[in-house]
Regions:
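Short coil-to-helix leader/linker segments, especially the first N-terminal amphipathic alpha-helix
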Residues: 42-48, 53-55, 161-167
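Domain-scale recognition of functional cores that engage charged ligands
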Residues: 66-67, 82-85, 90-200
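Low-complexity, highly charged intrinsically disordered N-terminal segments
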Residues: 1-46
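Short, solvent-exposed beta-strand-terminating loops
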Residues: 27-31, 79-86
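Conserved metal-phosphate-binding beta-hairpin within the catalytic cores
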Residues: 48-79
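Residue-level signal for well-ordered alpha-helical segments
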Residues: 1-7, 40-42, 52, 69, ...
Length: 200
């Protein structure tokens, strides 16, 4: 069973979709403005001030629909569920009736390739345009106990089909002495500052 999955496709009215687009564009602009970054940097440690040059593959803006339209509930820099929800929604799509929704999800292989390409693009934004992504680690605290572990497994298969070695690691196992480090970490752990002993 897919988390959050239902059997009904909910279509947004154009005004609500436009409101979401405007809000996301506004927030993205603010987050990358010099004045906002200076404000955040003033009270932050070196890990927060580090600017890797990439935007984030699964930067997520969680909107809930209500009587007055969409309301922003959460901004998530490492959102999960894109692959699972994409596959589920694609299974409900009727291209003849819902062409606007289905265009980004069908064929499924195209959607999957876009997800892989996002990770490659993020990697190259930091390492250079010709860099090869050879190994990726999906990292979380006690990953097998996580709500979206099924998606971790699907992502491993997806990366491996694209010729990228992939594995699921516990946060505390990521940087053991003598262990080969991955080229890229998809960090699902919510301890983003790595400020406790297990992620130090």
């Amino acid at each position: 069973m897919i988390p959050y999955a239902g059997q009904t496709v909910i279509a947004l009215v154009p005004e609500h979709y436009a409101a979401i687009e405007r809000t996301v564009a506004l927030l993205d602009g603010i987050a990358h403005s010099a004045s906002y970054q200076a404000e955040v940097d003033a009270g932050a440690d070196a890990g927060v001030r580090f600017e890797p040059g990439n935007r984030g593959v699964f930067m997520g803006y969680d909107f809930h629909l209500g009587p007055d339209g969409p309301r922003l509930i959460e901004i998530n820099t490492n959102a999960g569920g894109a692959l699972l929800n994409g596959l589920h929604t694609a299974s409900l799509c009727d291209p003849e009736r819902l062409a606007c929704i289905c265009a980004d999800l069908l064929p499924i292989e195209t959607m999957q390739a876009r997800i892989v390409q996002q990770f490659i693009s993020e990697f190259r934004a930091v390492r250079g345009p010709e860099a090869e992504l050879g190994r990726i680690a999906i990292v979380d605290e006690r990953p097998r106990e996580q709500f979206l572990f099924a998606e971790f497994e699907l992502l491993v298969k997806l990366f491996e089909q694209a010729g990228i070695r992939a594995e699921i690691l516990d946060t505390e196992d990521l940087a053991r002495d003598g262990q080969e480090l991955p080229d890229l970490v998809y960090l699902r752990d919510k301890a983003l500052l790595f400020d406790d002993q297990r992620s130090g």
